[in-house]
A protein has these predicted regions:
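Hydrophobic targeting segments
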Residues: 2-7, 16, 23, 28-32
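Hydrophobic/aromatic residues located in beta-strands of well-ordered beta-sheets
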Residues: 5, 29-31, 80, 108-109, ...
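Conserved short acidic donor-positioning loop in nucleotide-sugar-dependent glycosyltransferases
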Residues: 11, 34-36, 58, 67
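A conserved acidic beta->alpha catalytic loop
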Residues: 33-42, 87-88
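Short, high-confidence coil segments that cap the C-terminus of an alpha-helix
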Residues: 75-77, 104-107, 183
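Short beta-strand-to-loop acidic/aromatic patch adjacent to the donor-nucleotide binding site
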Residues: 77-88
Length: 221
């Protein structure tokens, strides 16, 4: 079964180049350029990945689903692992998630980070609040609801494509709809990596958090 690494990327820096060179064509890599204006990084990784590009920034959810559609149309038996472009996911962790998904084809596998005093306060607090609200509204216990490192097999592709949301709220919607669709999930411990002040992230603390909590409240009604 083929492992496919999917990376949505908006204005990435050289950390994406480093990741792709580390992978070094050992696995199939698909990068979705979500309307970036600077193409230098994409030029640097063209020998290490298949790149899908479009002109306007559509959001992470849209980029993920664009990649999913391409994979569904071009592959049959596979496991997809979604990684972020900011260098905060470890390749070994990604492959561990793939290994579990390969043996559990009907399960969404989620990378679970742990936070300590070295973790930025805003990240630590935000994840704790989201975890509490998510459990309160859904009854599901997921420790790391905001983890972008996730893997699943071809059996869940139609589910992943059916989920609404074009930006960061998409990843939360994937979790919110698990229960009503009787889809299993499993969390696996991964490294918690924060590079500098997390400046590579394009997550808007206010705007994107508002959309995420809005979706949680909507699903609980």
């Amino acid at each position: 079964m083929e492992y496919i690494i999917l990376i949505p990327a908006y204005e990435p820096d050289n950390k994406l180049v480093s990741l792709l060179k580390k992978i070094n064509n050992k696995y199939k890599v698909i990068v979705v350029d979500d309307g970036s204006t600077n193409k230098d990084v994409f030029e640097a990784i063209k020998d290490y990945s298949y790149i899908i590009s479009y002109d306007n920034n559509m959001g992470k959810g849209c980029a993920l689903k664009t990649g999913f559609k391409y994979i569904k149309e071009n592959y049959k038996n596979y496991v997809v692992v979604c990684m972020d472009a900011d260098g905060q996911h470890d390749l070994k962790d990604a492959i561990n998630l793939c290994d579990y998904a390969k043996e559990n084809l009907d399960t969404l596998v989620i990378g679970k980070r742990y936070w300590d005093d070295k973790t930025p306060w805003s990240n630590r607090t935000g994840n704790k609040i989201t975890r509490y609200v998510f459990k309160k509204k859904t009854g599901m216990s997921i420790y790391d609801t905001q983890s972008g490192l996730r893997a699943f097999s071809y059996k869940l592709m139609d589910y992943m494509l059916s989920i609404p949301g074009e930006r960061y709220e998409y990843e939360m919607n994937v979790l919110l709809d698990l229960k009503k669709n009787n889809i299993k999930y499993h969390e696996i411990d991964i490294k918690t990596i924060y590079i500098g002040d997390n400046s590579s992230s394009h997550f808007n603390a206010f705007k994107d958090s508002y959309k995420i909590y809005k979706e949680i409240i909507k699903h609980s009604k």
